[in-house]
Amino acid sequence: LTPSFYVGSAGNISAGVIERYIESQRSQWMTMRKAFKYRLYPTKPQARDLERTLFLCRQLYNAALQERRDAYRKAGVSLTYYQQKRSLPEIRTELLEYKGVHSQVLQNVIERVDLAFQGFFRRVKHGENPGYPRFKGQGRYDSFTFPQAGTTGVKLQKDGKRVLLYGIGSVKVKLHRPLEGRLKTATVKREAEHWYIVFVCEVEPKPLPPNEETIGIDLGTNPHFLVTSEGEMVEAPRYFQKAQAKLAPAQRSLSRKKRSSNRRKEARKRVAALHRKIANQRRDFHHKLARRLVKQYGTIVHENLNIEGLARSCAAKGVQDAGWAQFLSILAYKAAEAGRRVIAVDPKYTSQACPTCGHRERRPLWVRVYTCPGCGAHLHRDVAAAQNVLARAWTGPSGVAIPCPRSPGL
């Protein structure tokens, strides 16, 4: 539909007004948010200013949390985000150190407290373990956010080599890939001894050519991270397990160091560096595998696993090392950007049923290959599970087949 169509139907409304309205709607429905993470290289004074900003934000977070607790215990009143936000100008007037922190950064701190309580009440409502919001100790508050970085607080210089941060100054940044879209927010993060900035931008999806290929995937921990319904087996990298030869001695060394000593700080940095390397390796593996699946298939089907519950089971270490939740999150956003479809299905009995005849039988986990007693099919346990996952995507709860969807073109 064009502006001229609307003008012919809407009387005296000008074409310009209609066109602006169409553009605003297109922007609202045809964009997505994408994060770009870059390494910062602050000078020593700038690093101290960044640490000071984190300290002040943590101090404000704990004070806001304490205020909410006191208000409810003493007066039975639940403070809101807006009530607490109104006190920020007074805080900046009385405590001059807070003038060096952008007002919207402080507002975001109050918003984090509010989100923590929203999560608490939601868990109470759903009968889950509530987990009352806790105070942030030293080293437990590692980021601050400029919620309107596109207009205030943050400015990326034209050469792309420095970023101007309110209260910090011009900080060297390494843009290893170009920034895309319209800048919305910026978050400065501390990871061990390194600093990063994460820009969240509003970008338009980049759909790939339509693809009718569908695939079912079964996630695992050892020996395979992922098995497809076509029989492809992706070996589990097990980065955490492989790093134990270095990580275990580093952690033992840390535990022997005297608290608050310089040697303990150095030992903590070594442990953090090893964990950061493991996380980076795992994230890189997830990104590359997800991108390959999205390029190759139009529809990807996986089990809707209770990953949080599995992370508390006897398989917890393997599940956390595999990083299923991160992989599925990356897969979902890459699929959305490329115009692909990702479907989550009920995982019940997918590893017990025969994909050929439907015969169901429990088997020990160590049994990887078996012969179905119902039809005699010789099957690999994980491949059969992936085939069941794929079949379940096109079958409704009543067993009625659902037509295989075409890949949506965003």
Residue ranges and their predicted role:
Residues 1-31:
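Charge-rich, low-complexity N-terminal segments
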Residues 32-410:
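Nucleic-acid substrate recognition interfaces
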